Structures are given as structure tokens and as C-alpha cells.
């Protein structure tokens, strides 16, 4: 296990030497790749699929920036002591972080202007396009449309909340929290705890999808 206190102590004592030494450790490169990959999966699987928050143009650009950092972390993790692989990882990390911040700031500005009661706040604000342009002309919207094709408007984040299936939320939360606590103290009984929590969660997700499809059908009629 990584000694976090020891790493922090070394960083405070000799910051330059410590940073150079960290770059030669595979763990930190994998940590960057896993962290960014986890955020991409969270944005897609939870916000886009579960909450039906369609990604806008800036959103897919932010995903691309995170994907670049995942790629750089995996490349550098092959051999962190190789100067070429480490340089690729550093360039990807800096490029992804800078571009991610850039698009995040732009999206935040659009969100502020859209939700500002002052109509003059929209002056000069550029909207989002449904035809994204990725660096190097990569047709990511065609290769992976589920992940990189913008289908929403910038600044309009309206998740579909639970309706009649909302009564299952306390059962899901309480059941799974209780199961996690039981997993630490008594793994054998945790199986029965999850037996109550997981089906409730699956049923709530099913009801959410059913309600959403029914609303779409009513709008179409």
C-alpha cells in the first residue's frame, strides 16, 4: 500500500526530486488513467443513461480531454522509466487537463448565461453545435456516437427524476448502506442484506425507464 503520509512528507521536503521520482512510478500513471476513465464512465453511465442528461458539444469535448489523459496514463505506465513513453504521458496529461479546463470554463459560462434572469447575459454567448470538431479531424462522433455525439443543448441540465417509483429510493439506500456495513462485520449475513437491496435497486431502475418511455409515447401522440 502506498504510504500517503510519507509521499506528502517527501514532497514538502524535496519537491523537485520527489516529483521526478513519482514520474517513474507506474502506480501514479495508472491512478491518473483509472481516475479519468472512471469520470468518463460516470458521465456516460449515470448522468447520460440513468438520468437522461444528454451531452452537449462542450461535454463531449471534456470527455475527449479525459480520454487523452487515460491514453497518456496507460502509455506511460508501460515503462515509466522510458523517457519517450514518459514524455508522451506528460504531454497527454497537460494537454488533457488544459483542454478540459478550457471547455469546462466555457460550459460554465454558458450555463450561467442561460440561467441568468437578465436577458443581456446571453449577449455574445456562442451556442453549441450538434456537429463536433475534434482535434486531428478524428470522427469520434461516428466511431462512438453513444459517447462522443452531442445530443443536448449547452447549459440545460435537466435530469429525469424518479416519479412514481420514488418510493423505492429509501429501500435502495437503506438496504445497500446496511449491506455495506454488514459486509465489514459479518460477510455471511451481507449476502442476505444485498438480496433485499439489489432487487429493489433493479426494480427502481426498471420503473424509471418504463415511466420515461411512457412519457415519450404520450408526447408523440
UniProtKB/Swiss-Prot annotation:
Pfam families for this protein: DsbB (PF02600)
Signal peptide: none
Gene Ontology BP annotations: protein folding
UniProt subcellular location: Cell inner membrane
Keyword Iron-sulfur: no
Database matches in PANTHER family: DISULFIDE BOND FORMATION PROTEIN B, PROTEIN-DISULFIDE OXIDOREDUCTASE DSBI
This protein's name: Protein-disulfide oxidoreductase DsbI
Annotated organism of origin: Lelliottia amnigena (Enterobacter amnigenus)
Lineage, uppermost ranks: Bacteria, Pseudomonadati, Pseudomonadota, Gammaproteobacteria, Enterobacterales
Gene behind this protein: dsbI
